[in-house]
Amino acid sequence: MEQFLLSVGLLVCLVCLVKCVRFSRYLFLSFCKALPGSFLRSMGQWAVITGAGDGIGKAYSFELARHGLNVVLISRTLEKLQVISEEIERTTGSRVKVVQADFTREDIYDHIEEQLKGLEIGVLVNNVGMLPNLLPSHFLSTSGESQSVIHCNITSVVKMTQLVLKHMESRRRGLILNISSGVGVRPWPLYSLYSASKAFVCTFSKALNVEYRDKGIIIQVLTPYSVSTPMTKYLNTSRVTKTADEFVKESLKYVTIGAETCGCLAHEILAIILNLIPSRIFYSSTTQRFLLKQFSDYLKSNISNR
């Protein structure tokens, strides 16, 4: 019995040590300059960004272009993409290709594949997604959009990865960034469908990373919490709530840190705090009522009127 307890104690100490080492790497990288553009350019000439018309996708489009990559912008609204395309070309000198596609539909991927043909794609950012309810809501009150959420949040990641990964494999290099969410790390009641869809992205990404990391391909899932974007109704920014530009610039520092990252130091600290709460307590009725009130009040008081 004594030997067993000693083994358990050593295992716990080892887990804590690994977490401390990982967090120290975050601290170090957070104070470093951004990843050299040469690293991203070594992956290939082009970056493909889904959901590039707004928010995090738009920010990735500009930032990757600043690092010297040509960019393919894919989103639903052509007018937005054309404006962004002109600004990227004017300010960075990178080439831009625009592809109009509605990711809530299934019949778009042959068209996208045709548009990507012949491009040396080194970076794929699977960013497109939809949140059926910003304020906490029961599943049946949002289930009318369930098929659109599945297509946009899950099917898009699978299909776009299929289109691009096979070419990365043949060149033995590439970077795929899949944007999940902090609410995909553990089940979140009142965001059930969104949480489940983002959990798929987490599991899919981490499994793929194991399959393809020995082939020179980095596949990383990002699990941010609060980012001020059109999808979150432009939440007021703070030390925790980042602008899309802030989040993207910091996230690119961590592309070599491992298969999963929150994307910024503030969210990593928040994740550590949340993970300290035992599931039995987190999912208790009392805790859920408390979180529901606190989170609803926070959202209502911080949603911008932009």
Curated annotation (Swiss-Prot):
Catalytic residues (UniProt): 194
Record-linked InterPro entries: NAD(P)-bd_dom_sf (IPR036291), SDR_fam (IPR002347), VLCFA-Steroid_DH (IPR051019)
Gene3D superfamilies named among the record's database cross-references: NAD(P)-binding Rossmann-like Domain
Enzyme Commission (EC) number: 1.1.1.62, 1.1.1.64
An individual GO BP term: Leydig cell differentiation
Pathway as given in its UniProt record: Hormone biosynthesis; testosterone biosynthesis; Steroid metabolism
Record's keyword annotation contains Transferase: no
GO CC entries: endoplasmic reticulum; endoplasmic reticulum membrane
Record's catalysed reaction(s): a 17beta-hydroxy steroid + NADP(+) = a 17-oxo steroid + NADPH + H(+); testosterone + NADP(+) = androst-4-ene-3,17-dione + NADPH + H(+); 17beta-estradiol + NADP(+) = estrone + NADPH + H(+); 3beta-hydroxyandrost-5-en-17-one + NADPH + H(+) = androst-5-en-3beta,17beta-diol + NADP(+)
Subcellular location: Endoplasmic reticulum
Binding locations of substrate: 181
Enzyme class, first EC level, given as a word: oxidoreductase
Binding-site residues, NADP(+): 44-73
Keyword set, alphabetical order: Endoplasmic reticulum, Lipid biosynthesis, Lipid metabolism, NADP, Oxidoreductase, Steroid biosynthesis
Statement: the UniProt record of this protein carries the keyword NADP: yes
GO molecular function: estradiol 17-beta-dehydrogenase [NAD(P)+] activity; testosterone 17-beta-dehydrogenase (NADP+) activity; testosterone dehydrogenase (NAD+) activity; testosterone dehydrogenase [NAD(P)+] activity
Family statement drawn from the similarity comment of this UniProt entry: Belongs to the short-chain dehydrogenases/reductases (SDR) family. 17-beta-HSD 3 subfamily.
Reported function: Catalyzes the conversion of 17-oxosteroids to 17beta-hydroxysteroids. Favors the reduction of androstenedione to testosterone. Testosterone is the key androgen driving male development and function. Uses NADPH while the two other EDH17B enzymes use NADH.
Protein name: 17-beta-hydroxysteroid dehydrogenase type 3
